[in-house]
Amino acid sequence: MFRIVNGEDYSPAVQQRNSLDFGKAPSLLWTDNGGSNDRCETGGNGRESGQDRVKRPMNAFIVWSRDQRRKVALENPQMQNSEISKRLGYDWKMLTEAEKQPFFEEAQRLRAMHRNKYPGYKYRPRRKAERPQKLLPADSSVLCSRMHIEETLYPFTYKDGCAKATRSRMESRLSHSQPTNITSSLLPQEHRSSWTSLSHDRVT
């Protein structure tokens, strides 16, 4: 079907109305890093739709490292975040129990406030994305191909069901494509004499 386009659809008034309607879309993605909550609202049926994801209360180390991280970053602008974290962890271990005590008390106070504000709070860790399975290394592929070749050449050492199918497949393949002397060299020692006599009878 074809739709007849009206020239008024592209007028400034219609374009302004469409832009206002687009701004009223229900989808909203907003993250507040400064507060204690992370809000993520979408117009679909997402798990976080219309719900607030509450952060865990800070522990003593986080309380202490907030100002220390900012201080170290200002003093060392070239230092990466991972290096700053390692340094803060080392400095925290070097503090005495008396120096850590004020931060433990502050963390306990924040935990009590968090409990009163969110009485039904339960910690729900985020699920990590599953990593794709690694491909087999070259050594493993070579080993698998070698085992397949040995199974083709020496099928008599495996189970009876697999041996019969493999042996018949090998005999039909060798009888059509391989000469007699090569096939006799590929067979095990215990079956070489019977195969040679069978070939000799065919020639005579």
Swiss-Prot record:
Alphabetic keyword roster: Activator, Calmodulin-binding, Cytoplasm, Differentiation, DNA-binding, Nucleus, Sexual differentiation, Transcription, Transcription regulation
Stretches with biased composition (Polar residues): 175-187
GO terms, molecular function: calmodulin binding; DNA-binding transcription activator activity, RNA polymerase II-specific; RNA polymerase II cis-regulatory region sequence-specific DNA binding
InterPro entries, per database record: HMG_box_dom, HMG_box_dom_sf, SRY, SRY-related_HMG-box_TF-like
Ranges of compositional bias, category Basic and acidic residues: 189-204
Subunit architecture: Interacts with CALM, EP300, HDAC3, KPNB1, ZNF208 isoform KRAB-O, PARP1, SLC9A3R2 and WT1. The interaction with EP300 modulates its DNA-binding activity. The interaction with KPNB1 is sensitive to dissociation by Ran in the GTP-bound form. Interaction with PARP1 impaired its DNA-binding activity.
Pfam families given in the database record: HMG_box
Parts forming coiled coils: none
Similarity section: Belongs to the SRY family.
Function: Transcriptional regulator that controls a genetic switch in male development. It is necessary and sufficient for initiating male sex determination by directing the development of supporting cell precursors (pre-Sertoli cells) as Sertoli rather than granulosa cells. Involved in different aspects of gene regulation including promoter activation or repression. Binds to the DNA consensus sequence 5'-[AT]AACAA[AT]-3'. SRY HMG box recognizes DNA by partial intercalation in the minor groove and promotes DNA bending. Also involved in pre-mRNA splicing.
Name of the protein in question: Sex-determining region Y protein
Organism per entry: Eubalaena australis
